[in-house]
Design a protein with these regions (language model features):
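Extracytoplasmic beta-strand/coil segments of soluble accessory domains associated
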Residues: 73-120
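Short acidic/polar hinge/loop motifs at secondary-structure boundaries
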Residues: 119-152
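N-terminal Sec signal peptide and the immediately downstream disordered periplasmic leader
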Residues: 1-78, 105, 199, 203-204, ...
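Surface-exposed, low-complexity loop segments enriched in small/polar and acidic residues
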Residues: 129, 233-239, 277-313, 319, ...
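C-terminal beta-barrel architecture of Gram-negative outer-membrane proteins
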Residues: 647, 780-880, 895
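C-terminal beta-signal and adjacent terminal beta-strands/loops
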Residues: 788, 839-851, 855, 878-933
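N-terminal periplasmic accessory domains that precede
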Residues: 72-75, 79, 100-103, 135-138, ...
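Repeated loop/turn-to-beta-strand initiation elements of outer-membrane beta-barrel proteins
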Residues: 212, 329-332, 451-454, 535, ...
Length: 933
């Protein structure tokens, strides 16, 4: 399949332009001088030629409607340049749950700047992986979008921090007159995942003739859930033995009998403070039904019963825009918006093992000192010696069975407490619900003052995310209930009172807030005539004030619940900037540009970023272009403010406790999990980048446009978590009478500037329209991105991620495919338009180079160790019933292709939701109607 797809792309990108030249041309273009001068994303200077020195993709509202895309997130995730680190709301374990982010060039969501009408938005109140700030593209309305411009080039010299990989500028309608309503209704071929969208816009007045225009828009979206268990093949099962893998269902013992597993009824072992276990290991408590008692000696339960391929989501957006002429020179534009979105994450039942520390991470005072807790709670569950569920208690009904299991050595365990290892499937499943409201007010004043085109802007954006947690067990409440016998495990779990669960796992809430206030002023004018046009200059300044307050889940912040992926952040960030830009058409065929910007941060210091561009029209049909830019990203509040994030990871070997003669545990010897507390560092420096692009624009005839661009980005001073060093870990107290240190409780690792990365590749894009005479028009579109290199350098060691499933530590282990792209063929004849789009993602080798040349578990059931490529077909049609009514139809994943098996990712189960979601959803049908009056 991948060879055929490669051939298809080669044909479309190289052969179609030649086919187009043989067709009848459409009407000629107007002379360039008659075109209106506009501002293209990446510059503050007006121009008539939309092909600038920097590569810019433009997606119009018509393009979006044809594809049946119903959200900005859907639009941006179809970009071929969106790669590793991209974030979708389908990632059930995301720290930034309920949100979506775009990652141009695979440089993560914090390296892509998202603008609305050229202005910044407040970042989502929850940071990606507890660290990276980003704008939630899933909450932005689609009904008022005129176009989306994607600048695939560094632009810090124009826009400041975060624009290392590029800029997404969502441009809304400048004015609207009349009434327009549209509705879309969709469902999968399995009659689930129902999607609804309603949008209505009303406007009156004309800015040119009436001196004003006012329009209002309301948009509603709803998407029903799709359960994992309702899909076929490996999507709805964790027993992957038929596919050459292992049985990963809950309760399967993955080793010798007695090896602990998260069984449905639990397993126990005598509590020995030295860490030693009996040779027989853990004993399975009675209570497992005959159908769940499995071949491995465990008790099966199915995690897929709780998982969602697509969570339920809902959104409501309200927008008003008032444009008013003020005298002969000034125009005022006031935009008011409220965006509301709701989503949820379903996790698995609470699972407990013997020992991961529940790290407290509340802050004390303004100096950012962590609250000290010398005896933190852990995920270790201990059944007291007198518990009736403890099989080492002679009064327990399990005593006889345990005695038979352990044999002659059982007498040594009688009367001891017991370690419990298992899944508490009787307690309601963990669910996190997100309700985000974004309020935005922006005022733009524009005027032509003499030769200066001037813009003054001010705005305020406030994003609030209310989070509701259910099903998360408090360690203190659980241990208390075990101690007094009110909570039972094993076959006695059915004796628990439903009211007890409200004490063990109460519903809790917190509200995270992110806000942005800004003021900006910029002006541009021609300076002097040059042979190719006017030398033009732009100057400007802006000020921004950012606030973030995420208090965290109230029990997680004091280390009382096991919530891998919880975090706390609070702080402010102020920045003041000044910039200038020059555009010099030195010859009719040669354009040069330069820009420079200075940003002053209250904590990160001062950054100076220049940019240079050149475009040379070699012949009328061929132009060459290139850019060179410096960029930077200031540390976010979650990285440098009063903040911390708790998670767990594979434990490194502890040489102080893992060795001959030491009473080590599996965790001491690198065979378990350990808690990690990532802490902020106020001394962080900004990340810096150097980027350049080299490209060509080829237009053999007016109906064909082909662009190809090489990009190369080197980022230094990257902000990462410090390595796990056992000598710096937080340990338990040394046991009396011993000469070795206590066990590691957790690692407290600050963020540091410690890595660099290099990303390079090619973008190719083709647009070709040619006449079929009386049969209408045929349009061919193709775009692709090929990654040559995606390398991270840490302590001098290079890790090459391009074409692999790594880096697995990033945003749900999205992976880094070398190639993404699509090919579209569209036929239009009078009121009818029919098209098809072939989407492609290349295969990925099943290794994470940072973990060594080892095939990650079950990435593929064959010895080649790779995740297969994914190709799927979409089709769409439009019929203009009357000049006022347009009917649309779309089918996504027409052939119902399954996504490739991928167990390296933890963003989804057995597939990659960030890149292959249409495969998991399956064939999806959508019908829409648009009415315009």
């Amino acid at each position: 399949m991948s060879h055929w797809v490669t051939g298809t792309f080669a044909t479309c990108l190289l052969g179609l332009p030649l086919v187009g030249t043989a067709q009848t041309s459409g009407p000629p273009r107007e002379p360039q001088s008659s075109l209106e001068a506009i501002v293209v994303t990446g510059s503050y200077i007006r121009r008539t030629d939309t092909e600038s020195p920097s590569p810019v993709d433009v997606l119009t509202s018509d393009d979006i409607a044809k594809r049946g895309l119903t959200s900005i997130a859907d639009v941006l995730h179809t970009l071929s340049s969106d790669n590793s680190g991209t974030l979708t709301s389908n990632f059930s374990g995301a720290m930034a749950g309920g949100a979506s982010g775009v990652s141009l060039r695979g440089l993560t969501v914090d390296a892509t700047l998202v603008l609305v009408d050229g202005h910044r938005m407040a970042t989502y109140p929850l940071a990606d992986d507890g660290q990276r700030p980003f704008v939630d593209i899933g909450s932005l309305p689609l009904g008022i979008v005129d176009r989306v411009e994607v600048l695939k080039d560094g632009a810090s010299a124009i826009y400041g921090s975060d624009a290392i990989a590029g800029v997404v500028n969502i441009i809304t309608k400048k004015q609207f007159t009349g009434f327009e309503a549209s509705t879309d209704l969709g469902s999968s071929s399995k009659a689930d995942g129902l999607a609804q969208r309603l949008s209505a816009t009303y406007g009156f007045g004309d800015l040119g003739t009436d001196q004003h225009n006012i329009y209002f828009n309301v948009e509603y979206r709803h998407q029903a859930e799709i359960k994992q268990e309702d899909r076929g093949s490996y999507l709805n099962q964790l027993d992957l033995r038929p596919y050459g893998g292992s049985d990963l269902r809950g309760g399967i013992v993955q080793g010798d009998p007695g090896t602990p597993a998260y069984t449905a009824v639990g397993m126990v072992a005598p509590l020995d403070r030295s860490g030693a276990l009996p040779a027989q290991g853990y004993y399975l408590l009675p209570g497992c039904s005959a159908q769940n008692l499995n071949y491995s000696g465990g008790c099966t339960w199915d995690p897929n019963l709780y998982k969602k391929i697509q969570p339920r989501s809902e959104g409501l957006d309200l927008t008003a825009k008032w444009s008013q002429k003020i005298g002969d020179r000034w125009t005022s534009t006031l935009a008011l918006s409220m965006f509301q979105s709701e989503s949820e994450q379903w996790r698995q039942p609470n699972q407990y093992l013997d020992g991961t520390t529940l790290v407290p991470f509340v802050w004390a005072g303004a100096n950012g000192t962590l609250v000290d807790q010398t005896n933190p709670a852990t995920t270790q569950i201990v059944l007291p010696a007198n518990s009736l569920d403890n099989p080492f208690n002679p009064a327990s009904p399990y005593f006889t069975g345990a005695k038979a299991y352990y044999g002659a050595g059982f007498a040594n365990y009688v009367g001891k407490a017991a370690l419990f290892y298992g899944a508490l499937t009787d307690i309601p499943v963990q669910i996190t619900k997100y309700r985000t409201q974004v309020y935005r007010v922006v005022e733009d004043l524009t005027a032509t003052l003499g030769d200066w085109d001037t813009t003054l802007s001010a705005g305020f954006v406030d994003a609030q995310t209310r989070i509701t947690y259910t099903g998360f067990v408090r360690a203190s409440a659980l241990n208390a209930a075990l101690a007094d016998g009110t909570y039972r495990v094993g076959q006695n779990a059915n004796l628990n009172s439903p009211s007890l669960y409200q004490t063990l796992a109460p519903e809790t809430h917190d509200t995270a807030i992110s806000s942005l206030a800004f003021f900006s002023a910029n002006a541009s004018r021609p300076l002097m005539p040059l042979p190719g046009g006017d030398l033009a200059i732009a100057v400007g300044a802006d000020a921004r004030l950012t606030r973030l307050n995420n208090p965290g889940e109230p029990y997680a912040t004091v280390g009382d619940i096991a919530m891998d992926g919880s975090f706390y952040a609070k702080g402010t960030q102020d920045v003041y900037s000044a910039f200038t830009e020059l555009s010099a058409p030195v010859l009719p065929s040669l354009e040069m540009s330069a820009a420079a910007r200075v940003d002053r941060y209250n904590a990160a210091g001062t950054a100076f970023t220049p940019k240079f561009g050149i475009k040379w029209k070699v012949i009328p049909q061929l132009a060459l272009r290139g850019t060179f830019a410096r960029g930077f990203r200031a540390p976010g509040i979650a990285e440098s403010g009063n903040s911390s994030a708790a998670s767990s990871t594979f434990a490194p070997l502890d040489p102080a406790r893992c060795g001959a003669g030491l009473p080590s545990t599996p965790t001491d010897c690198g065979q378990g999990y350990v808690a990690v507390l990532s802490t902020a560092n106020p001394n962080l420096k900004p990340e810096h980048s150097r980027s350049y692009t080299l490209g060509l624009i080829f237009e053999p005839v007016h109906s064909i446009n082909f662009t190809a661009d090489y990009f190369n980005i080197r980022r230094t001073n990257e902000i990462v978590g410090a390595p796990l060093d056992p000598s710096q870990a937080v340990r338990a107290a040394q046991a009396p009478g011993t000469n070795y240190p206590g066990a590691i409780l957790y690692y407290a690792t600050p963020y540091i500037n410690d890595s660099a990365s290099l990303t390079s590749g090619f973008d190719g894009e083709l647009r070709s329209t040619f006449s079929l005479g009386a049969l209408g028009y045929l349009t061919a579109k193709a775009d692709a991105t090929y990654l040559i290199e995606s390398t991270q350098i840490i302590d001098g060691t290079e890790y090459h991620y391009a074409g692999t499933v790594g880096p697995t530590a990033l945003s749900g282990a999205t992976g880094t495919p070398r190639t993404r792209g699509s090919v579209t063929l569209e036929w239009s004849y009078q009121p009818v338009t029919i098209g098809a789009t072939l989407n492609y993602r290349s295969h990925m080798y099943g290794v994470d180079p940072s973990n060594g040349p080892v095939c990650l578990q079950l990435t593929d059931p064959n010895p080649n160790c790779y995740v297969a490529s994914f190709t799927y077909l979409d089709m769409y049609a439009q019929y203009r019933v009357t000049p006022k009514i347009l009917v649309t139809g779309n089918v996504t994943n027409v052939t119902n292709r399954l996504p490739p098996l991928n167990t390296a990712t933890y963003g989804g189960t057995n597939y990659n939701p960030s890149l292959d979601q249409p495969g998991a959803v399956g064939t999806f049908f959508q019908l829409g109607v648009n009415y315009r009056y």
